[in-house]
Amino acid sequence: MAASPGPAGVGGAGAVYGSGSSGFALDSGLEIKTRSVEQTLLPLVSQITTLINHKDNTKKSDKTLQAIQRVGQAVNLAVGRFVKVGEAIANENWDLKEEINIACIEAKQAGETIAALTDITNLNHLESDGQITIFTDKTGVIKAARLLLSSVTKVLLLADRVVIKQIITSRNKVLATMERLEKVNSFQEFVQIFSQFGNEMVEFAHLSGDRQNDLKDEKKKAKMAAARAVLEKCTMMLLTASKTCLRHPNCESAHKNKEGVFDRMKVALDKVIEIVTDCKPNGETDISSISIFTGIKEFKMNIEALRENLYFQSKENLSVTLEVILERMEDFTDSAYTSHEHRERILELSTQARMELQQLISVWIQAQSKKTKSIAEELELSILKISHSLNELKKELHSTATQLAADLLKYHADHVVLKALKLTGVEGNLEALAEYACKLSEQKEQLVETCRLLRHISGTEPLEITCIHAEETFQVTGQQIISAAETLTLHPSSKIAKENLDVFCEAWESQISDMSTLLREINDVFEGRRGEKYGYLSLPKPMKNNANLKSLKPDKPDSEEQAKIAKLGLKLGLLTSDADCEIEKWEDQENEIVQYGRNMSSMAYSLYLFTRGEGPLKTSQDLIHQLEVFAAEGLKLTSSVQAFSKQLKDDDKLMLLLEINKLIPLCHQLQTVTKTSLQNKVFLKVDKCITKTRSMMALLVQLLSLCYKLLKKLQMENNGWVSVTNKDTMDSKT
């Protein structure tokens, strides 16, 4: 049986659709980085899977052949519609026209070839039992399928370049207008240009926001979110800082304040473009060192690999890796804000880890020369000991950083220093300004260092990026508050200078609030709370439009409708428990299938809470938004399962693919229902959505169970093969 195709870019860097004897693989250079492209390909991949996953030289009933022909024709028709859209895009983008047209021609030819190869009108080999024996050119179908997927992917990626071009063009317009704003000398001219700037920023915010939501890479999404947050907050700062400069053109601190805002916005704009184009200017590389928790995680994986392979790596590499991790501990031990008790405990655990690594290396050397049971047990004990020490070290570091952050946030909750700076400003008290500016600088250094420590123990790359963003924000905003306060102190009666200081102080307070949220998220990750059930919730912000505000009011169905929703929700809640039980069976909790399954269960649980009037989902619009994300996560799960199926034998693979092909249509149906407008029938829409979700969760439970069994079977077969191979090797030596 040919390897089944899976969506490009799923579970790997390249867009590889399969391998094996069929050679059903796509150009590995076609890397897919966005969810929209991936999801556009999924229905096509599913149909092609149906076409090529059949045995060669088998008897097929007339009904089966007609079904195959219908799929072939459907693929061809879908490709035809797709090509028309591609050609329209080409006509609007002359710089990409030739490339898109070539890919469209290839796609059209491949679609026609598949339709021709699955056409049964010319088959007349009817057997006596009413069955038709077909000798379809399966190699031809696979070649055409490979060409089709490759060309369709090329068109989608070229169309994606159009989106990137739009974002770059929008950024360039914003930059050009910013340059005009920097040079403006009159209020009237400033107001006109800023109005244009505001419109351009709104356009850029929409384009970059859509791109952020479309990115597959969570690290890039977090970086994009950080850059967009800077732009959003700096837009108001730019307005007040520029007005202050125009009001007080000879004030040095006002100019310094304004320049700081412009510089930060330019850096953020460049960061967005860097992310969407996936390239750094002038060949720059990411110089930020990995966090302590990430280093410990990688180190533990290396020592645990010794259970399987004693020659996997060198002793020197392990020693160097541990020393690098312990060297980074200096961020904690050298910090003036780390308590004496925490410092002593960190140093003690670091010394213990060094000693246990030396013991492990000693046993490891013995294990390489002596293959005895006692040595193997001693090696296992050494691995467990150092793993335990590292876990204790992680706990101590986490306790140190989070306790410091919590104390700091509590201490600065009333913003005494900011209030004092505002007061000294309107009083024109330069002496008091110097005193409170010094206090704010101290507070800033504390917060910056705390963010640095939190990054080490954050636990995930997106949270690491959020910590870096918080650190940079405190660093920059602290200086800007001082320059804004200095301007007000020099011009105490200036309303615009006071307004400007207020804006920067609000930005500081907002970042303090964000840091509280960040601390909660870091604790949730560390403790593995069920609080992660809300991890994928991303609610839209209410608009000022009355219609939108109306739709965001909590929906109140009648008692009968509430009872029906509650009943559906109860079944959904039970299914999330079943899914969680299946997930707990897996030894490898980092497995992609497990991660997507856990995410779906998490979101389904928040839907269940919604049916009880609890949890974070407050309105039907919140619910619909969450369901859209749930459907997308389901499609990602099917992609990972398809990738796993390629490792299985034909019968097991077919059994798994049948389950996948049940889930994919449900995901698409749920996406369709969420987009369908049902005026004054909100309950009907919610009812349909929860019913679809329940069906998907039931399939998820089956899929998780089946994948777990097939994985265990695969591991046993592989272990058996290794044992036989080793025995044959020993026999040959004898």
UniProtKB/Swiss-Prot annotation:
Topology of the protein relative to the lipid bilayer: Peripheral membrane protein
Family assignment from sequence similarity: Belongs to the vinculin/alpha-catenin family.
Organism encoding this protein: Homo sapiens
Primary residence: cytoplasm
A biological process term (GO) from this entry: cell adhesion
Keywords tagged on the record: Cell membrane, Cytoplasm, Cytoskeleton, Membrane, Phosphoprotein
Tissues and organs where the protein is expressed, per its UniProt entry: Widely expressed. Expressed at lower level in neural tissues and at the highest level in the adrenal gland.
Claim: Metal-binding is one of the keywords in the record: no
SUPFAM superfamilies, per the entry: alpha-catenin/vinculin-like
GO terms assigned for molecular function: actin filament binding; cadherin binding
Cross-referenced Gene3D superfamilies: Alpha-catenin/vinculin-like (1.20.120.230)
Places the protein is found: Cytoplasm, Cytoskeleton; Cell membrane
Protein name (database record): Alpha-catulin
Residues modified as Phosphoserine: 374, 538
Role this protein plays: May modulate the Rho pathway signaling by providing a scaffold for the Lbc Rho guanine nucleotide exchange factor (ARHGEF1).
UniProt keyword Phosphoprotein present: yes
Induction per the UniProt record: Down-regulated in cancer pancreatic cells undergoing differentiation and apoptosis.
InterPro entries per UniProt: Alpha-catenin/vinculin-like_sf, Alpha_catenin, CTNNAL1, Vinculin/catenin
GO cellular component: cytoskeleton; cytosol; plasma membrane
